[in-house]
Amino acid sequence: MHYVTSKRNSLLALAVFSALSLTSSVYAADYVMPDMTVSGVREGQSTEVDSTSVVKPLGGIADQEQSAGLLGAKDALDTPFTSMTTTRQSLDYFGTPAKGPTDMLSLNPSVRDSSSSLYNDISIRGFKINGHGMYLNGIPGMLDQQHAADVYIDKATVISGPNIGIVGTPNRESAAGTVEFTSKRAQVKPNTDITLAYLGGSSMKEVVDIGRRFHNNRYGIRIMADNIHGNTAIKGENIKGHDFFVNIDQKTANSKTNLLVGYNYINQHASPYTFGFDNSLTTLPSAPDANRTYKTSYSYNQFDNWIVTLNHEQKLNNHMTAFFNGGYHREDWFGYIDGSPKIINANGDYTIKMTNYTLGITSKYAGVGIKGKFKTGSLKHDYVVNVDRHWYEGFGGNVPTWGNNGSIIATGNIYTHALDGSQYYLHNRVEGGSPWSSTQIVNGWHVSDTVSTKNDKWQLLVGLHGHRTTISKKDGSKNSYNGINPTYAIIYKVNPNISVYASHSESFMSGQTVGSAYANRGEVLDPNKTKQNEVGVKIKNGKLLHTLSLFEIKQANYNVDSNNYYRRYGEQKDRGVEYTVAGSVSPKLDIIGGFTYLDAKQALNGKQVNGTAKWSSTMALVYKPNTKLSIIGRAQYMGKATIINEKFNVPSHITFDLGANYDTKISGTPVTFNAMLHNVFGKNYWLPMASSNNLLLGQPRTFVMSATMHL
């Protein structure tokens, strides 16, 4: 389903109209959080603080309180794995027009960018993940894999490595880790924020964000909408889209509820994605100009998404709480004519085989459970029991009446910018629904207990997750399998500011869905087992949190065969070291970043996993010389990687971003100005993707700026 232009324009009008009728102020509660005391802070900053602990936000761009899935919100020192929570402010500061949420996630050194303006993909510790494998308000399967909406995002938490034992049952393998977004709620201070943003090229974005609370702060409503349009900083690329989200929450002494309803629509023309390389090539061509597209003007991706999430908690007594989490997501990729350039010689000539390929998914989730506390002698127990079901239907297939299933070939050259797509005009474009391809039903259960000694000096986490999955495919086949996934961990608190931990986790779920760049696109790969071991230490120094960890992950390896089918190929073993730091060095300086060393090997041949660099690092700084001005900077480094089983070396690269944020008043109205120059030196570079022989072209130098009125 998609809106016509008049309906798209009405979204912002509806949000503005709603602002005129909203009054009162606030109490916000998270769907898995304990009772909270909230202080009024300018929108975009972290505002929720646990009244029962000393947990405070780590400056403005990170938070020491982190969502740990079904375990609820926890102090970072009490989580036995590498994790990081970034706030809305980090997205406002560092988000690019092309990638949005990806830039928020990639502040975490565990995360490596694998995205373009068309897909918001990442990898964590050498394993890929897209929106379908992420969580929204604790619910799996609610996000799309394409250019993602971000107007509703308040926080993002990344837990590195497979952690199915502490989250709701997904429908697919999540070896990379757990990524969870939390939606904005109405805050203590009512907000009416109107933003006008320039996104590079001739593209613009208008945003409305309104929050109010009612009935002695019991009920809250947050309305968020945006409109995006224009030619981007990449010459030849055009984007049109809009998002509209409403978040409603309530809280009493015995219950709390959160409902998020959203819709987003995008129409992108000539948006860049991957480059492939012909087998005849003996050297990797240098990266071409990133300021232009290498696709034909008629290539496009048009899709929309409906998203609904519901979370409810009901206090049964002083020691027990029942909870429900439910969600619905419909993704309709009804317009698709596209293909990826394949470079065929050292001169930079390339071809594109175009396909007319529509896709769709319907994902539904429901989970109920009980959580609570009890004691056995001097030991404290914090337990969770949960059962859930995940329904997933996939739709997709080439439209056989167009292009003879990919025979249309566009030709061009990455250096001379020659491009011929004239064969397209011999064929008619077809849009519409997609044929059914598969149905997957996953029934899951979860039991965990965190046992703590006096003063939480020692903590032991023991958890089991089980599920039964049934997959029905269009070829008539029907397969079922069962999986039991243990999670266990131990934490020792040296003192209140230092913790040492060790953990083991396993995951056994359906394989990933093959992407559109491969001949078996849309196929759900067979299930496989993932195991991770991790040891680490966390140190809190004032408002600065340090984490140092060593990890090992084993999982099935994937590769591309000579017919461009993405298949399982032996085992992948990743070993590495991570260091993360987040928080405030001083009242005037915030810092977030770290580094990862990753030794990812293919067990069958001992070679480096395709598209996986050994070294990567990210570091972002926010300097606040006074209360009005913030100077923002970020550096991102990616070390050398290899592709096609070490045939080509992908050069290392480093990029820099620089910007500023300024708060002032105009005629008595508070206004926030933001300006950012991404890729300051305009570097052209290849960006590798984990377990892939294709490469992305890095984003060009892009200047963005915005003005937000706080009415």
Predicted regions and their residues:
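Periplasmic N-terminal accessory/gating domains of Gram-negative outer-membrane beta-barrel systems
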Residues: V41-E43, E48-D121, Y135-A149, S160-I166
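A beta-strand signature from Gram-negative outer-membrane beta-barrel systems
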Residues: D150-D193
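Transmembrane beta-barrel wall of Gram-negative outer-membrane proteins
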Residues: N191-D193, Y198-Y273, Y298-N317
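Surface-exposed extracellular loop regions of Gram-negative outer-membrane beta-barrel proteins
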Residues: N267-L281, W391-G396, I491-E534, I539, ...
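Membrane-embedded beta-barrel scaffold of Gram-negative outer-membrane proteins
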Residues: E313-K315, T321-G327, E331-G339, D526-L598, ...
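Structural signature of Gram-negative outer-membrane beta-barrels, strongest in the C-terminal barrel
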Residues: I361, K380-Y392, S434-Q555, S584-S586, ...
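Gram-negative outer-membrane beta-barrel transporters
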Residues: N455-K457, E552-K554, R568-N645, F681-N684, ...
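C-terminal beta-signal and adjacent terminal beta-strands/loops
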Residues: I591, K640, Y662-L711
